[in-house]
Amino acid sequence: MVSSTAGYRSSALGKLKAFISLTKPRQLALLMLTMYGAYFAGGGSLDPRMLALLTIMGFTSIGGVTAFNMYFDRDIDAIMGRTRRRPLPSGVLNPYEALAGSLALVIAGVLSAAAINTYVALTVIAGLYFDIIAYTQLTKRFTPLSIIFGSIAGSMPALGGWAAAAGSITTGGVLMALIVFLWQPMHVWFLGYYFKEEYSVARIPILPSNGNPRLVSSLIAVSLAGLIAVAWAFALYYGYGFLTAVITTVLAALAISRIGGFARTGERREALKLFKFASPIIAVVFIILPLERTLVYTLLLG
């Protein structure tokens, strides 16, 4: 009886860990950082109830959407070498367990968002639509343009964080969401280039597998230039964020210079390095901007 109970607990714990991995914890943490950063950059308070709701909303909605995508993409994951050991293709979780858990998280995400305000709930619903339906169901397997819908979905946590602070969707939230949107080609395409053979085997049309290093590099450089422009537009519009804009400019310019080298060689190792360089860029923006706002308002209010 004791060994049977211990085995059950071990199995249950293993399934819980497996389900948590479906939420892609690292990606989840980065997107929640954009949510918190936008919330505090928009003047959000340290009210415990609000922070609790925001945390629950972020974890359940972002994690739930990601887990849903894992459920729908389990056939692709079984083909690609880097994903076939994930919980669903490896059999650690069955599809019904993944679907039930994903649905529970998404429902909790929508309800907690609605408890904050209507605009936050709308960003969660928009994220669900653009990620699960527009991206995963309608475009991912058919066109490289699917990145547009995936990037819109990825920018919703930032828009929702700002809406939680401002009480509505305003210019600042749109600009912060646009920063995330313009950052994502670097994040997605360099990883896609590194694994382009696997994407080809799985018949997933992404630009790196169909194009060439120069085309990929040019489009990513344009998106980073746009990111710089949006960072400066935010600073000029709100009167704070100039330090963030300067640092963003330096990091993006450094990335563009390295992208130039990749365009000439097309080396996979360099693509992986550039993919890893993408996360610090977005992290810096969403950490420094709220700190800068706090400093500016503290000085102004004396």
UniProtKB/Swiss-Prot annotation:
Its EC number is 2.5.1.141. It holds the Pfam family UbiA. It is found in: Cell membrane. Pathway: Porphyrin-containing compound metabolism; heme O biosynthesis; heme O from protoheme: step 1/1. Signal peptide: none annotated. The chain crosses the membrane at residues 28-48, 50-70, 93-115, 119-138, 147-167, 172-192, 219-239, 242-262, 271-291. CDD domains: PT_UbiA_Cox10. It comes from the Archaea. InterPro entries: Protohaem_IX_farnesylTrfase, UbiA_prenyltransferase, UbiA_prenylTrfase_CS, UbiA_sf. It is a multi-pass membrane protein. It catalyses: heme b + (2E,6E)-farnesyl diphosphate + H2O = Fe(II)-heme o + diphosphate. GO terms for cellular component: plasma membrane. Belongs to the UbiA prenyltransferase family. Protoheme IX farnesyltransferase subfamily. Converts heme B (protoheme IX) to heme O by substitution of the vinyl group on carbon 2 of heme B porphyrin ring with a hydroxyethyl farnesyl side group. Carbon 2 of the heme B porphyrin ring is defined according to the Fischer nomenclature. NCBIfam families: cyoE_ctaB. This is Protoheme IX farnesyltransferase. It comes from Aeropyrum pernix (strain ATCC 700893 / DSM 11879 / JCM 9820 / NBRC 100138 / K1).
